[in-house]
Amino acid sequence: MRILGIDPGLRVTGFGIIDVSGHRLAYVASGVIRTPTADLATRLGTIFQGVSTIVREHAPDQSAIEKVFVNVNPQSTLLLGQARGAAICGLVAGGLPVAEYTALQLKQAVVGYGRATKTQMQEMVTRLLNLSGQPGSDAADALGMAICHAHGGNTLSTLGGLAPALAKKGLRVRRGRLVG
């Protein structure tokens, strides 16, 4: 199975592609989509076209993208949400299912600690994929998103969807974990 991970951003959108066979992960490609210093519509179009091209060239089976977090600056949050929307449109236009994970879920799945630093993420991605060099932070986050989806991301999403049934049994999902 081939998974495309996306780390959305208005200026720089990271992408990472891995192949998964059982518990084995193999690096395929990674990089960034840089948008020009231009109006918002042009930047969003660049993200959409870039993601669409990656989907066409690498033919992933599934995709995973980071959920928007609420920033201190509401305007920044809105802009990030629009960039994310453009990326999702590129994924959906390519016929891909889209899984969504929070930054906390991503870091927990890849590093084992939800408050991991960018450097820790880069190091773990490098080790997990046996890379010869360390990817940039945006590409590393995108590769991490693909790894998260491959290794338990599905479980985290499923647990979140089961929340109402779990609550009836006195259980809940907290930070991606089942707790009593």
UniProtKB/Swiss-Prot annotation:
Its main location: cytoplasm. Its cofactor is Mg(2+). InterPro entries: RNaseH-like_sf, RNaseH_sf, X-over_junc_endoDNase_Mg_BS, X-over_junc_endoDNase_RuvC. The active site is at D7, E66, D138. Binds 2 Mg(2+) ion per subunit. Its EC number is 3.1.21.10. Pfam families: RuvC. Keywords: Cytoplasm, DNA damage, DNA recombination, DNA repair, DNA-binding, Endonuclease, Hydrolase, Magnesium, Metal-binding, Nuclease. GO terms for cellular component: cytoplasm; Holliday junction resolvase complex. It catalyses: Endonucleolytic cleavage at a junction such as a reciprocal single-stranded crossover between two homologous DNA duplexes (Holliday junction). Homodimer which binds Holliday junction (HJ) DNA. The HJ becomes 2-fold symmetrical on binding to RuvC with unstacked arms; it has a different conformation from HJ DNA in complex with RuvA. In the full resolvosome a probable DNA-RuvA(4)-RuvB(12)-RuvC(2) complex forms which resolves the HJ. HAMAP family: RuvC. This is Crossover junction endodeoxyribonuclease RuvC. It comes from Burkholderia lata (strain ATCC 17760 / DSM 23089 / LMG 22485 / NCIMB 9086 / R18194 / 383). The gene is ruvC.
